[in-house]
């Protein structure tokens, strides 16, 4: 029987706060690191820097709206759609793989992250979930940027470096997946709400970028 999702997430967070880098690296069921993993680590580091810079710029530019982590309502757009936290569990918590494979996902990849071709199922599942996260955020950011570009004030729009960093890591992972197109809104955009949404999305994405970077670091050092 799978443990309750809430209890599992709490357990993961407690473990993350106590496990050091090497412990996690030894626990993760992976093959020996390949040059592809090192390349993906570089991409994940670039992504983390890019989203951090974009968030900092947004907080400075949008100083008249709530844009700090204490002020915003935190939202995870991947909730109930992907399972990255569970899929990237360390070995000691991976007691039942069926608990982590509750969704149908494509595990076919030509990406350089798995260039060795001998990665474990759990590693592939983890990287596939990361790929799906990135695709969702990419779609959200592109839709949001299109709205921001319509703002007569032209106050802020997304840094191309961040969008490029997302695309580069997606290409390195290169999983086959079905992208569900977003429906275009016929409503007149509310630019104030869009900017608040931007702050919320950037905070959430930075947290996910930290998780992705740590995951790639563990894979590279294991």
From Swiss-Prot:
InterPro entries: 4_helix_cytokine-like_core (IPR009079), IL-12 (IPR050676), IL-12_alpha (IPR004281)
UniProt key word Protein biosynthesis: no
One Gene Ontology cellular component annotation held by this UniProt entry: interleukin-12 complex
Keyword terms, alphabetized: Cytokine, Disulfide bond, Glycoprotein, Growth factor, Secreted, Signal
Domain of life assignment: Eukaryota
Localization, UniProt: Secreted
Main location: secreted
Residues bearing glycans: 42, 96, 110
Biological-process GO terms, alphabetical: immune response; interleukin-12-mediated signaling pathway
Signal peptide extent: 1-25
Disulfide-linked positions: 40-113, 67-199, 88-126
GO molecular function, one term: interleukin-12 receptor binding
UniProt keyword annotation of Disulfide bond present: yes
Task performed by this protein: Heterodimerizes with IL12B to form the IL-12 cytokine or with EBI3/IL27B to form the IL-35 cytokine. IL-12 is primarily produced by professional antigen-presenting cells (APCs) such as B-cells and dendritic cells (DCs) as well as macrophages and granulocytes and regulates T-cell and natural killer-cell responses, induces the production of interferon-gamma (IFN-gamma), favors the differentiation of T-helper 1 (Th1) cells and is an important link between innate resistance and adaptive immunity.
Subunit structure: Heterodimer with IL12B; disulfide-linked. This heterodimer is known as interleukin IL-12. Heterodimer with EBI3/IL27B; not disulfide-linked. This heterodimer is known as interleukin IL-35. Interacts with NBR1; this interaction promotes IL-12 secretion.
Entry similarity comment: Belongs to the IL-6 superfamily.
Designated name of the protein: Interleukin-12 subunit alpha
């Amino acid at each position: 029987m799978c443990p309750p999702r809430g209890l599992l997430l709490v357990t993961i967070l407690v473990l993350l706060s106590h496990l050091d880098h090497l412990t996690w690296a030894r626990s993760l069921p992976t093959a020996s690191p390949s040059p592809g993993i090192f390349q993906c680590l570089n991409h994940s580091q670039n992504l983390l820097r890019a989203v951090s810079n974009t968030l900092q710029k947004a907080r400075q530019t949008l100083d008249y709206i709530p844009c700090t982590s204490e002020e915003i309502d935190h939202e995870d757009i991947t909730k109930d759609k992907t399972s990255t936290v569970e899929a990237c569990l360390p070995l000691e918590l991976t007691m039942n793989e069926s608990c982590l494979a509750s969704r149908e996902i494509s595990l076919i990849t030509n990406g350089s992250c798995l260039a060795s071709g001998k990665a474990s199922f759990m590693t592939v599942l983890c990287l596939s979930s990361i790929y799906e996260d990135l695709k969702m955020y990419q779609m959200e950011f592109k839709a949001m940027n299109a709205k921001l570009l319509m703002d007569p004030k032209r106050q802020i729009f997304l840094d191309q470096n961040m969008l490029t960093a997302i695309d580069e890591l997606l290409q390195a992972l290169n999983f086959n997946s079905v992208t569900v197109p977003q429906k275009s809104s016929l409503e007149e955009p509310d630019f104030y709400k869009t900017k608040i949404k931007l702050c919320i999305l950037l905070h959430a994405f930075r947290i996910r970028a930290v998780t992705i970077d740590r995951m790639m670091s563990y894979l590279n050092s294991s």
